[in-house]
Amino acid sequence: MTKTIIHFFLVILTLSGLSLQAQKRILYNIQVTYPDGLKKNSTVYLDINNDKADFYEARFITPGQKPSGLVQAIERKSGTSENTILVQDFKLNSFRIKTTDILDWKLTNDYKTVEKYKLQKATALFGGRNWNVWFCNEIPLAEGPYKFNGLPGLVFEAEDTDGVFKYSLMKIENLSKSSVQPTLNVKNAVNITWEKYNKLLSDFYENPYQKERESAQKGNEIVYEDKEMKVQDFTKMTKDFQAMIRKNLPPYVEADKNFLLNKTN
């Protein structure tokens, strides 16, 4: 976070003021470090509209942006632990998962200053990761990126101790009638549990060409990229698909929810 950016959002805070009944759009940079060491940065948004909080990817307000992972957005009543998560599967079907996520925050006596704002450090074990979070008591918004809320001030930074994820506050804007609104009410999104959702992912991972394989077994002609496919061809294609998923699937913020945890191939 540079001094220029910090100064920009501090000016906005000073001019507009903040309250518990706020209408704010908070922009965070998220840096994700992949297992091969590759680092990817993107912008995510947290809209606080009175008693409602929406956390989402840039693609929901920026045309042409592609999804960066399976978890697309999170909606909740601000200050509560009841989250509704918008997710996709490998076939781009959309689902909604309702979760209760109570974070057991441990407040520390560690402080640092960002410009004139004093930040306090808090820690929590969440989603199979240990998290260090810096929040500002002077900004009485009990919110933050992803599911990191419930602290006595706005979250400025959140990072897991393995360095896989790092959220950094970029700036704060006022929400108004002229603000571009995210389209989170995805049509045909099906309500589902984490368990059933992970089973869908796992089943497709194990047999992504099930219909094509079964059709070929019945003697039907299957053509893929101008090549007639035999039953045995789908075995190699499946292994290639699985290798691609293991290499390219973005890390999960909640590592203990990753459907690949118990996969050995």
Kindly give the residue locations of the regions a language model identified.
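Bacterial Sec-dependent N-terminal signal peptides
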Residues: 1-26
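Exposed boundary/loop context
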Residues: 10, 15, 109, 143-146
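Homeobox/homeodomain signature
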Residues: 10, 16, 95-97, 159-162
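Covalent nucleotidyltransferase core used to form phosphodiester bonds in nucleic acids
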Residues: 96-99, 123-149
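Generic detector of intrinsically disordered, low-complexity, polar/charged segments
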Residues: 14, 19, 113, 147-150
